[in-house]
Amino acid sequence: MSSEKKLKAKVLREMKPEERRELLNQLRAELVRLETQRARGFVEKPGRIRQVRRIIARILTIEREEELKKAKSRS
């Protein structure tokens, strides 16, 4: 998952919704693992927690934007 460092909004928008959801699930699982490590007092890359949270937020934001566009086009 090292390539996720460069996941900018532009790249995420170009992904298919299914790909984004799959990535979102993977990132959430990684975040749980990292949070567990942090609770135990050992995290290899503490900055990765922040990075993963931000990528998750980007994905959720993009999904919400697309949802609002669809709703707007229907009305």
From Swiss-Prot:
Pfam families recorded: Ribosomal_L29 (PF00831)
Ranges that cross the membrane: none
Gene3D superfamilies hit by this protein: 1.10.287.310
Isomerase keyword on record: no
Signal peptide positions on this chain: none
One GO-annotated biological process of the protein: translation
Cellular-component GO terms for this entry: cytosolic large ribosomal subunit
GO molecular function ontology, one term from the record: structural constituent of ribosome
Sorted UniProt keywords: Ribonucleoprotein, Ribosomal protein
Family matches, as NCBIfam families: L29
Matches recorded under HAMAP family: Ribosomal_uL29 (MF_00374)
PANTHER family in alphabetical order: 60S RIBOSOMAL PROTEIN L35/50S RIBOSOMAL PROTEIN L29 (PTHR10916), LARGE RIBOSOMAL SUBUNIT PROTEIN UL29C (PTHR10916:SF0)
Family affiliation: Belongs to the universal ribosomal protein uL29 family.
Protein name in the entry: Large ribosomal subunit protein uL29
Species whose genome carries this gene: Pyrobaculum aerophilum (strain ATCC 51768 / DSM 7523 / JCM 9630 / CIP 104966 / NBRC 100827 / IM2)
Gene name, Swiss-Prot/TrEMBL: rpl29
